[in-house]
């Protein structure tokens, strides 16, 4: 993509309305634009990140055996009345009437609807297990939306729902999805800790929150130092991982640690995922019954698995930034490479830039080629801000010898590379 043809409305000044780093950087880098309190338009750069995260989440859900569906944003209120949850959400749930005076709502979650889908289509234990997921926009009318997309009113979520014949099988599915979440966050390039949690209004028997470690996190997490090995050793047994200590500050008790205090560390964390073993709460209330192996009707056992896709964008930035801007993990970066031509009127610079652009594009590496008239200092500031993992810098002096500079955005290290060999260094 040529920057001269791209829509990248960067801001030079810090927006006064932004309170946290991710909100400031998303506005400054032209990722989003606020349309109302807690409601944002996703501009091209931000949408690319959102799609990259969505694709990684979907890939890991598919690997775990979940099947993708797409439920509507708008839900009939009678399903929530049937499940007994209609009044639980209070004013956070946006309710309205259609022209026929039917009460509808903008779904804040989907347990009720997925239970309705299940009960009308699956009747026998022979059709189990089933695991369905969707990625859809949701709305919660937060009384005080803040922190940009971290706590907006409209947000993108991945929700999965599993159905099993009994508790034993339901826990097996839960463990499979627990491992899928570990893999998902590893693939996203972030360090996430699973913490035992309360089920809240969702209900149920077993629950874990996943917190990305970031200095600006809202919660303090105390956890076993062995969690740091997950990035390099993803095949650790789920039961072993679940046995490691991890607790949020309100549940951490130094007098009840199962291991020595020296084996524990603490960090700030941002919650980005929550999984629940619900049990039969919804299936009993909504009569989602199946014929078991003995020919008797039994309520299906359910679990729910959520990941905040749009919230993840902000959380990843909070964990990967510096005073200059964003530092994207390679897997989610909107562009893997910023190609910076310092003199677009120098024929050799143009030649090398064209070659680098073609070579990288031919390998399906996404490149943002800065072919603008901006001054070098302005170009460096822009590309440091938007956070491409690699920067290729082409100036007249080194270009004369077929040399370009390759800068690693995270470390700041710069290497001189022959343009012919450039492709071998991008990964």
From Swiss-Prot:
Its main location: cytoplasm. It is an enzyme of class 6 (ligase). Pfam families: HGTP_anticodon (PF03129), tRNA-synt_2b (PF00587). It comes from the Bacteria. One of its GO terms (cellular component) is cytosol. It catalyses: tRNA(Pro) + L-proline + ATP = L-prolyl-tRNA(Pro) + AMP + diphosphate. PROSITE patterns: AA_TRNA_LIGASE_II. One of its GO terms (biological process) is prolyl-tRNA aminoacylation. It is found in: Cytoplasm. InterPro entries: aa-tRNA-synt_IIb, aa-tRNA-synth_II, aa-tRNA-synth_II/BPL/LPL, Anticodon-bd, Anticodon-bd_dom_sf, Pro-tRNA-ligase_IIa, Pro-tRNA-synth_IIa_bac-type, Pro-tRNA_synthetase. Its EC number is 6.1.1.15. GO terms for molecular function: ATP binding; proline-tRNA ligase activity. Keywords: Aminoacyl-tRNA synthetase, ATP-binding, Cytoplasm, Ligase, Nucleotide-binding, Protein biosynthesis. Belongs to the class-II aminoacyl-tRNA synthetase family. ProS type 2 subfamily. Homodimer. NCBIfam families: PRK12325.1, proS_fam_II. Catalyzes the attachment of proline to tRNA(Pro) in a two-step reaction: proline is first activated by ATP to form Pro-AMP and then transferred to the acceptor end of tRNA(Pro). PANTHER family: MITOCHONDRIAL RIBOSOME PROTEIN L39/PROLYL-TRNA LIGASE FAMILY MEMBER, PROLINE--TRNA LIGASE. This is Proline--tRNA ligase. It comes from Rickettsia akari (strain Hartford). The gene is proS.
